[in-house]
UniProtKB/Swiss-Prot annotation:
It comes from the Bacteria. This is Probable dual-specificity RNA methyltransferase RlmN. The gene is rlmN. Its cofactor is [4Fe-4S] cluster. Keywords: 4Fe-4S, Cytoplasm, Disulfide bond, Iron, Iron-sulfur, Metal-binding, Methyltransferase, rRNA processing, S-adenosyl-L-methionine, Transferase, tRNA processing. S-adenosyl-L-methionine binds at residues 158-159, 188, 211-213, 287. Binds 1 [4Fe-4S] cluster. The cluster is coordinated with 3 cysteines and an exchangeable S-adenosyl-L-methionine. [4Fe-4S] cluster binds at residues 111, 115, 118. It is found in: Cytoplasm.
């Protein structure tokens, strides 16, 4: 965004800014609270500020998006298409459970990783999101649910480590300004050379989830074309460095594709690869999409794969994506809308 925006600024930065508008420094704290706690879209909403100031500054960009489309699944999951200042559309998902509210945020418009099984990858890459555009997604969900967001996962559109600078800025704000603990933040990556190492140097207590999806290089390249530039052994070496530096357990994500990477031999090979790792494996049965021919394995095949990992002392669980009825798996709702008539803004 060419013009400066307020969302993403710290309390000292907002205090400095408010003084440039002719207001006393204490107004900075008020602005900070209205921005991050009340989630305003417009400065004219700040009723504790003088009317003349609100009229003068009402059009100054806060940095909020508009909800272009929203869909709710029977399980309560809410999928949002958010329209950015330049008209581009991104996806966000709010996932409620009994004691928490998790937001799945996007870090890019589209994605350059081009994973064969991902709807977002089929749409190509447009641009990186700025930090405030990531923070905005969390505030949007928090306001819509009228419930405090407890967890944020960077598992929406885009490759977070390809946009590391803005992702780190958003993490700082989510932690310090919105009050979400670092251990409640998860960054997912398919792997970008040297960026896991760069993330480790930040000394954060977040969770890193590595999208592995295959036990060997050849199979990984066949479903993740960009993996040709990042051999699986180099990826795992960086993962070991990450654990050594951060003392944090890794998560490995593994999407199960029927007949592709879900065979018993694949499970045994994966167990061998991850032996000795301080990690947990999340097995994710595939969410079918219209653009690609992959299918979800049956429950028996899933359970056999899981049992083989357990027999090799690998910590593992099966994670079923919520919100399938709302096309909430990454990329699905946006892709479906692009094939249909434009949705009514609401």
């Amino acid at each position: 965004m060419p013009q400066d925006v307020l969302l993403g600024k710290s309390l000292p930065e907002l205090t400095d800014w408010i003084e440039t508008t002719g207001q006393p420094a204490y107004r900075g704290k008020q602005l900070y609270n209205w921005l991050y706690q009340k989630g305003i879209h417009d400065l004219s909403e700040i009723t504790v500020f003088p009317k003349a100031w609100r009229e003068q500054m009402g059009t100054y960009p806060v940095g909020r998006s508009q909800i272009h489309h929203q869909r709710t699944a029977p399980d309560g999951t809410r999928k949002y298409l958010l329209q950015l200042h330049d008209g581009l559309i991104i996806e966000t998902v709010g996932i409620p459970t009994e004691k928490r509210l998790t937001v799945c945020v996007s870090s890019q418009v589209g994605c350059a990783m081009a994973c064969d099984f991902c709807a977002t990858g089929k749409s190509g890459f447009t641009r990186h999101l700025q930090a405030h555009e990531i923070i905005d997604q969390v505030l949007t969900v928090q306001t819509d649910f009228q419930q405090r967001v407890s967890h944020v996962v960077f598992m929406g559109m885009g490759e977070p480590l390809a946009n590391l600078e803005q992702v780190l800025k958003s993490i700082q704000s989510l932690n310090q300004d919105i009050g979400i603990g670092q251990r409640s933040l998860t960054v997912s990556t398919v792997g970008v050379p040297d960026q896991i190492r760069a993330l480790a140097q930040q000394n954060l207590q977040i969770t890193l989830a590595v999208s592995l999806h295959a036990p060997n290089q050849a199979l990984r390249e066949s479903i993740i074309p960009t993996a040709v530039h990042y051999p699986i052994e180099a990826l795992l070496d960086e993962c070991r460095e990450y654990v050594a530096i951060t003392r944090r357990r890794l998560s490995f994500e593994y999407i199960l594709l029927a007949g592709v990477n879900d065979l018993p031999d694949h499970a045994a090979e994966l167990a061998k690869k991850l032996k000795g790792f301080q990690s947990h494996v999340n097995l994710i049965p595939y969410n079918p999409i219209t653009e690609v021919p992959f299918q979800r394995p049956g429950k028996k095949r899933i359970n056999v794969f899981k049992q083989i990992l357990q027999d090799h002392k690998i910590a593992v669980s099966v994670r079923y994506s919520k919100g399938l009825e709302a096309d909430a798996a990454c990329g699905q709702l946006r892709s479906n809308l692009r094939r249909s008539a434009p949705a009514t803004v609401k």
